[in-house]
Amino acid sequence: MARNLDPKCRQCRREGEKLFLKGEKCFTDKCAIERRNYAPGQHGQKSGRLSDYGVQLREKQKLRRIYGVLERQFRNGYELAERQRGVTGENLLQLLECRLDTVSYRMGFGASRSEARQIVRHNGILVNGRRINIPSYQVKPGDVIEVAEKAKNHLRIKASVEAAEQRHFPEWLEVDTKAMKGTFKNKPERSDLPSSINESLVIELYSK
């Protein structure tokens, strides 16, 4: 299966902001953005002015990297969002937030989205009591997400849940940290998601 093998800290520096790709490290002063807040490479500190197309492309790449999806998956998500009722950009963000790997990450079952994705692929997550090993599976309001019994004793998962609890869970999730189980109450509203994401630039890029 195709994967993005670029170093995660390098991806954050390329976008000029924290994408939270490396779990707990991103919340410490060891984060690469804290130490070298400029683009990687020989000319990283001499960033030139981007064209309108360049700005749109950078925003798309940033969004793809945040959610860890490849171009084909992202394009398919845009096309689905465009067919749905409502605002296309908000629909796209909701589709990304409803992915099983993202929901598992938000519930603290993985320190990062990539770690949560790996746990899903290894049959470590149940949805309504059924094993689902497809990271892109779309979680629906009312679905119950739970760490599989065999994975509940993994120290990394325990540590991730504890750290997520300290940072507080999103309003659209209800999580029982002791049972390692949570309910996806509803899809997040646009106001619930980071304002640093400008999804309208992505829609402008794809609609050309």
UniProtKB/Swiss-Prot annotation:
GO terms for cellular component: small ribosomal subunit. InterPro entries: Ribosomal_uS4, Ribosomal_uS4_bac-type, Ribosomal_uS4_N, S4_RNA-bd, S4_RNA-bd_sf. GO terms for molecular function: rRNA binding; structural constituent of ribosome. Keywords: Ribonucleoprotein, Ribosomal protein, RNA-binding, rRNA-binding. It holds the Pfam family S4. One of its GO terms (biological process) is translation. CDD domains: S4 (cd00165). Residues 98-158 form the S4 RNA-binding domain. Part of the 30S ribosomal subunit. Contacts protein S5. The interaction surface between S4 and S5 is involved in control of translational fidelity. Belongs to the universal ribosomal protein uS4 family. HAMAP family: Ribosomal_uS4_B (MF_01306_B). One of the primary rRNA binding proteins, it binds directly to 16S rRNA where it nucleates assembly of the body of the 30S subunit. With S5 and S12 plays an important role in translational accuracy. This is Small ribosomal subunit protein uS4. It comes from Nitrosospira multiformis (strain ATCC 25196 / NCIMB 11849 / C 71).
